[in-house]
From Swiss-Prot:
Keywords: Amino-acid biosynthesis, Cytoplasm, Diaminopimelate biosynthesis, Lyase, Lysine biosynthesis, Schiff base
Gene3D superfamilies per the UniProt record, alphabetical: Aldolase class I
Main location: cytoplasm
PANTHER family: 4-HYDROXY-2-OXOGLUTARATE ALDOLASE, MITOCHONDRIAL, DIHYDRODIPICOLINATE SYNTHASE
CDD domains to which the protein is assigned, alphabetical: DHDPS (cd00950)
Subcellular location: Cytoplasm
SMART domains: DHDPS
GO BP annotations, alphabetical order: diaminopimelate biosynthetic process; lysine biosynthetic process via diaminopimelate
Listed name of the protein: 4-hydroxy-tetrahydrodipicolinate synthase
Site (Part of a proton relay during catalysis) residue list: 54, 118
Enzyme Commission designation: 4.3.3.7
MF-aspect GO terms: 4-hydroxy-tetrahydrodipicolinate synthase activity
Organism name: Lactococcus lactis subsp. cremoris (strain MG1363)
Encoding gene, per UniProt annotation: dapA
Subunit structure, interactors included: Homotetramer; dimer of dimers.
Amino acid sequence: MSAKETIEKLKKARIITALVTPFKENGQINFEAFPKLVEDLLASHTEGLILAGTTAESPTLTHDEELEIFASINQLVDGRVPLIAGIGTNDTRDSVEFIKEVAKLGYIDAGLAVTPYYNKPSQEGIYQHFKAIATASDLPIILYNIPGRVVTEILPDTILRLAQLENVIAVKECTSTDNLAYLIENVPEDFLVYTGEDGLAFHAKTLGGQGVISVASHILGQEFFEMFAEIDQGSIQKAATIQRKILPKINALFSVTSPAPIKTVLNNKGYAVGGLRLPLVACTDQEAKIIIEQIEN
């Protein structure tokens, strides 16, 4: 799929859910848990899915497992919403080879490429890393800027430089409202700016951004949909009321390292998403109690 075709599809995708990976008690992927979860997400206004991203515990998934997830979700979704595959690592060569493999599948709309972690590259190294991935195949990529997890930040001017590449079509920006505003003001016309911070979904949309790539939309998709509808209609105060209502719930979902809280909530709601793979661990009983109380409040 060409960059232009994917951009047109993503223009309809304001709420993209970063999908969790369900696990069985033995640590294997629970593919049987996907159908109910995915169908309920689509019914509650998820307009795109991130597969094998941070929320999916991608650092502990093998590429073979990721490919199995892609195939499973593609069969379930059947073209109803865009599918974005996590393809990035801190190894440029590995990322290039994997995006080539993913591009051959034919049903993935874009790749999500995270800033190289641990290596601490310079801005030039970051640029060259993403350029190598973007030019390795026809599959367009979304930049994933999340310095809170990877330490290194893609500075706004580096994002603007990368945005000039035909196959770099969007950014998942997990920094500040200042950076969101600067990017939205200065990126090329068809370059899409998403926030990756659930608590900044209101801010990103009111600033003119595309929307949110979200963890909280596993359970708050309807609320995000209603908030964005109010913003689109110019009813900022009504949208702000929704933002104030959901913010404590969003904060609860990040009170412990994600995705432990969202998995706690989903398990409590009857979705068999199971536990986490080490080195991540499940919420303690006390943490889970507080999180569930806040969500149900």
